[in-house]
Amino acid sequence: SVIIDAVGKIGNGEVEINRITKTVLVIDEAQDMTEDEFALVEALIRKNEDLKVVAVGDDDQNIYSFRRSNSRYMRKLVDEYGARTHDLLVNFRSKKCLVEFANRFWETIPERMKQSRIISHDQDEGEIRIVQYQSPNMVIPLVQDICATPLIGTTCVLTQTNWEAIQVACLLKDKRMPVRLIQSNEGFRLCDMDEMRFFNRILGSQAEVHLIDEVCWAEAKQAIKNEYCEAASWEICRGIIQNFEQLYPCKYRSDWETYLFESKLEDFYAVRGETIVVSTIHKAKGKEFDNVFLLLNDNRDLLGDNQPVTDEKRREIYVALTRAKNKLSIHLN
């Protein structure tokens, strides 16, 4: 991979020192580092004696082990490099009872880096409902409950699998509820979208031109709007372009290409109050909603049965619980 090759070249002295001389290295979502990514961090540390490393992360939210990520690499910065830890303990998102509920749940997660409880900035009480089923047939009653619940603000239904998310979205649509299914771009890059290919063709691809001309950019924006404004994908395309404009006032072609390569489709779904968002827990990480309905089908282990539960699954559920701002409704069997 690119990262492994980079680590090898840095270690062998094949990279010009000015290309890797850094003063500060900031690692966001540090709990999701893989072995290769941590090897790159270590290579940069070895080549920069005075390098300051700032790692921002929450080991309770490491839910991407299927991508070989592990929070132990963030912990290594403390254990092997003597990094100091600063716990950010005030929650500005959720109502008081939701924060307390999440606190009680994370007590079941072993070997956590944080030991102090989270404190809610908002002292108003929210609402928690737990609906227990005796059957695995939970999707239809869940949808009925959603339709019968007065909803104010943004709403999301969280599921554990894509198939559950599709079922919920289809049933809500059948009930004539405004719904949006969050999908991901696993298996392809945003630059491979037909809409982005069209945009890039209008933009031009002269390799010798590093800075994108503002006139060309505006023409490409107008062209993609004219071509796709009636398409279901237009809102996502507009979000991709607008977000890049906010991040990069000076539009370099290399920045645009890297941005399309690294961005995830689920980051550009607009959330409107009247639309019910349906998503797997993994795709909703980093997002927040006023109302959250959580479908936990067949997690009998949480009810005290003998079926084992992994730490990964507990962290996944913790992530789901902490998406809610005001109301949390858990449907489980």
Where are these regions (language model features)?
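Conserved helicase/translocase P-loop NTPase motor core
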Residues: S1-L25, M33-A43, N48, E257-T280
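Amphipathic alpha-helical interaction segments
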Residues: V2-D5, Q167, I236-G239
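Short amphipathic alpha-helix with an adjacent loop that forms part of the alpha/beta core around
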Residues: G11-R19, V139-T149
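Conserved helicase motor core of SF1/SF2 NTP-dependent helicases
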Residues: V24, Q31-D124, Q134, P141, ...
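RNase H-like two-metal-ion nuclease catalytic core shared by retroviral integrases
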Residues: E186-N200
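Conserved helicase C-terminal RecA-like lobe
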Residues: F199-H331
